[in-house]
């Protein structure tokens, strides 16, 4: 009955009256606050150390709560960005106490007999970024609680936990300890299972809950506002979960307690198998589609599809790194709680935010495609882990130089180096480290066997750590109760530890701990402690008695003893020496059996030089001696030291062995004395006072330490001295590594400059400045010399080999804050704290000052090594200034200002101004400038434009003091306060940085070693880390060595070869994409697609119809040029016969013909229907007008030596008809784009390309077994034959080429048994051909009365097929007699109800020989094939029906209204049989979808449930009627592609088209990622802003595009919106480019005028009219500065159609723009030869600086290389055709040339070879090589081809 009072529940906080803190305790930062969400008071526990900030229930651990409830409810909320720990102590029935802990600090589940540790998964706000990225993340989402953490009701089934994990029976709850960082509302125990979603009040009005579940008590429930759902606001976690699918090794959110009947169970993210591909919702739908449509399956069935789970959309999120104190928590938590491991919980919704179009109809649309399929959404671990390994430390001491210990073997010494304990092997010099302290180590002590090491940490977090010395593991860590421990002493047995320090009031405090259990349980208990007013310098435990201690200090020597839990002491009567200041003590070593253990001498040393000998047993002073300095007899000889009563020398340390005594004194001497102190028998002089001496265990060596930072060993027998370590004695300020020698130079506040050997850690040289502090230092990159800047403003140049000062510069008045050499060492740069910067010329013998600028650098002396930064190519110099808010970039050769960036305005959301603290250039081009700011950010700026390309936020809690980037730019190092962080810059935001501790002071500088194999950090000491992700050493030797500029004299000359890798076409070197913009559900809005009407229907034209009408007119003109081939037709038709039967409404006429007269009949048809009118139907194929023509010959590349391979093709030809094929059983999927057949693997997205057609492919036909594909292309202008190619789908080989039709092929079809194949020509051809698939022999032909739009075989009768055309349907019958084949046709006119003007545009059979036909009026007619009559019509659409598919009782219609509809036609069969007596006379529309264009192709499965549909917009859609979803599979441009550009990084490209669309594509998957649509305008040119981007983060990138109305629009890619609209031109903008700095936009118009516009303000700076009257075709910029030109500005060129090229030099920062050169190229004298379609092309040559490459219309077809310096043509490359596009590779001497003859030519200028590639059906009007030279992108009308450049 004792537990009756606990029923039904116990409110623990109320039970203990927590607010009174009488029955409970709190420690640290625990406060009560009002929570707005819960609307009540809660307790907030926060602090850096969980063990020091907590609520303890009950007050002491010896008490017990005694709560017997099975379930423990904890209502809490983790604090965002922090870790928390909760400990629950429970008792089992056998009396055993078990601790159950859960924390988001734990990495994995751990279990012992008395402790269970569970990782905890923090929930986030529903729909937040963390919530969406946490799906399935088990290994990656390690870290603190997310920013959107929620209130959580955690239900622990304590009884089940003990039973499940430890097989124990639960008794009661003893205690609970809630540790920082969290908010807690209450705790509750009960035997009842409560549902937190429902409280008692709600339960009264609601339905009954399931059995065994009760409503949550009101005082424990969470409030839910009206209209909200509980689970949208809070998390409920039951552990262990009742779901078998949730893991038992972590505490995480599962499903709701009350589950609807039949609802599927949610899957555990922790138990899901790792996915090889993590993709967004639309593409997961596509993958689901692929799985369905590529998997062979049985016959169709009508069961509904069920979706088990809906995939989530991944959103990249930047990981928040752990900061200094968080890491301190972790360092403690490693011993207590394990590591960090987070499981992410699932949710099932993600908010999609769409951007609205603005007032001028700019539609910014995201396409439902992810960027890639390989980037996981969770935040991944940076690998390798750890990426650093601490290898060497240069340093000693820190807090103290009084502790250095021998190990028991004498092989190693142990000493502190600030916060690190170093174990140094004496012989080899190898180091190992004991890591864990976060502040300076103030004391060390070994036990007698050296198995245990005790170390004390000073500072506000004073603590003691006990170490297992051999393993290097920390056994225990505990508070010292004193502010700082100054001395530690271990007993010989290791069971007692004594510590001395000062308390908070400055009083001396002695604490004695019991460490006997430390090795087993990690518990350390305080035996005794005492406060005293006496001074204690040294205190040691007697090695013969663990309870006795001796101390000495100022005016005292005392004996101590621990007894009965108290610590008592008594002084030693020193008589007249009681006023001395005692410094150290030592017991007599050894033991004689005849004596008692305590009968020995105690030696005590003093600051006055005295050594006292005390009888320890009798506490009597025996003898006093004093060491005094000897007289200087000679300058090089010193008399032996003796003891006398004269003035003494301070003794700092004392060590006694069995045979001698060692003393370390203030005069810098280590002296060895015999035990009778008769005289010194050996001494060693040091540079500073000796602070510590220690005799080795064998007594043959003496370890000595000095206060000047020297650690050494004196070998007594050999009298040799070995310096083990030297160290700076104050903070290091800067360091520099020599590029070729293993040397490191450091400067420190101790006024010394030291040079170290990084291999041996030995100090090589030491330079001392007495009255000034060295502030900055840098090695000369070539010579054995270095420069050092001092606090006085002086810069000194030292020659190391001569150890001499070579030069001294005094141009500065303030302390030197920055000092750098140029990469070749010919220039030196310096800046000072008073704002001046200087440039020096450094020669081998002389050094000169070239330029000094004042008040340009921020006046701040705290910037240190990051004050100046130089790009690796030596061209750009950057610094913070002239104010702390600005960063200035200068020309490093002349100190001319190039750019000034205000970093304070880059963060628009910040309420404070951001200051720049330091900067660094990235090593590789484009040499991003990294700026650290006071807002704890790293800004990646484009050094040419100043644009922010990337931003890393929350880098450190305090300001970043140093940063560096690896040579391959993948890794970034940052230092802040005492931490080092490593960031992966290839995947920013997706990989957590690694954090490294060890420094006890702020890290002043961090950098990679020159060979990239190590990382060096300096602050309190020099840390050398092994970089485990170091690149291949060959990379640093070849790729990363910068090109060195020429020596600077009077003017800065430009190196013409240093930028040989830059792309000549600036448009091609746009920004890279870290992550693609998130796609939205809706597809881009498209304009209506209506058929090309006659001139009498102007109202049906859309904005794009003008072009179609023009094309139609051109087609009419072209039609008159087609030769009459009737004679050939007659000859070919003699081999077959045809019987034509025409049926009219009122009469029937039978025409029969034999084989002899069929030719005359056909000839009459040809004559009567010569030049038929063009059908007014969108279904009929009309080849696009092409002004290009096929080349007569080409240079085929040798087999196997092709320089180009076709990687991918972007686009689908929406102009084709039925030009897509898919087999649902085999998964074969193909479509056409131009003259190429693309076969795509729907699993991987990989493409195969079947080439061979010379013209645009009009249609495809796939056999029923999907083994053979037929494709047809036309004859174009008559120069090529119309081809039907037969392909083997297995290997892609062309088996046969059929030539029969003279123009285009409109439709093709295979019979049901694949024995027959029929092809029908277009309206100009008018022929039907029947083929046998066995050898593809022509069986029969027929001349058609009228154009035919569609043909299809009857699936029920292999010899029947039907065709449809204007006003009639034709039923064809094939009759075979022997080898003769005859075709009979019965032609039936459309019913009068449909109208005589209607055309039948599409047909399809069902399985019972019913024929459905679609009409141009939108009606569907149903025909009985046996009686040839139409018995049913209905209006299925408002437009022309171009697609019909029938499967069973379902019919699909697709029309030019962009709609597809699914009909139930079950009543049609009954109407056919019963007529008006049928029970149902109606058809029902089941579904409807509207797509982005008129429907031109469709293929569905046998149940018409899912399929693929193509539209005139160039899109292929996946349609699923069951789920009523449509997903884009393939996208493309509908109209001509006007321009394209490749983004930096080559993961994306951008294209723009005549339809006003600007599209961004993934080059890996060829998927459309983003589309900007401007209505009623054409987008004619585009350019990426010049800031590159390498990863997914929140920074922006922009694209500028020029339009036909003269406007320029600048679009933000990440924001998916238009940022600015500029109108600098009165007519169309034909060319656009960013300047290399990004400060201005250069645009050219159709009128020949060029505008210089600021993309920031939108203002037009100037207008250039030099090309007025001729449209601008090309504008290109280059940042290369050329030697020999009379200017040093940025170069750019412009070309116009009048064959003129202007070369300009501009300095936009100075508003300079000068015409440098003017090139005019001659044209043929005859006007009739003038070809306006040939553009003028010009570009800068990347591999020949100062050379312009030109091609255009002229006397000869050629490419010219013109030298701007020599003013002459250097090279002429002849061409076979005029070039319509031109691009040059930045990586090799390759030129790609496109021509109007549909050829792409690749010319290797170095080898003199050329290769032609034909994969186009129109002229190649665009060519772009990617920035790296690996990819070539070309465009031909609306198709974009991506080529791989081989051996580039």
Curated annotation (Swiss-Prot):
Belongs to the WD repeat WDR90/POC16 family. Residues 320-335, 1114-1129, 1164-1178 have a biased composition (Basic and acidic residues). One of its GO terms (molecular function) is microtubule binding. Residues 1102-1113 have a biased composition (Acidic residues). It is found in: Cytoplasm, Cytoskeleton, Microtubule organizing center, Centrosome, Centriole; Cytoplasm, Cytoskeleton, Microtubule organizing center, Centrosome, Centriolar satellite. Its main location: cytoplasm. WD repeats lie at residues 436-479, 481-523, 530-570, 644-683, 685-724, 727-766, 769-808, 811-850, 955-993, 998-1035, 1252-1297, 1300-1341, 1343-1382, 1395-1433, 1435-1473, 1532-1571, 1574-1621, 1624-1663, 1670-1714, 1774-1813, 1815-1848. Pfam families: Beta-prop_EML, Beta-prop_WDR90_POC16_2nd, CFA20_dom, WD40, WDR90_beta-prop_4th. It comes from the Eukaryota. PANTHER family: WD REPEAT-CONTAINING PROTEIN 90, WD-40 REPEAT PROTEIN. Keywords: Cilium biogenesis/degradation, Cytoplasm, Cytoskeleton, Microtubule, Repeat, WD repeat. Residues 257-278, 316-336, 1053-1133, 1151-1178 are annotated as: Disordered. InterPro entries: Beta-prop_EML_1st, Beta-prop_WDR90_POC16_2nd, CFA20_dom, Quinoprotein_ADH-like_sf, WD40/YVTN_repeat-like_dom_sf, WD40_repeat_dom_sf, WD40_rpt, WD_repeat_EMAP. This is WD repeat-containing protein 90. GO terms for cellular component: centriolar satellite; centriole; cytoplasm; microtubule. SMART domains: WD40 (SM00320). The lineage of its organism: Eukaryota, Metazoa, Chordata, Craniata, Vertebrata. Residues 1-222 are annotated as: Binds with microtubules. One of its GO terms (biological process) is centriole elongation. Microtubule-binding protein that plays a crucial role in ensuring inner core protein localization within the centriole core, as well as in maintaining the microtubule wall integrity and the overall centriole roundness and stability. Required for efficient primary cilium formation.
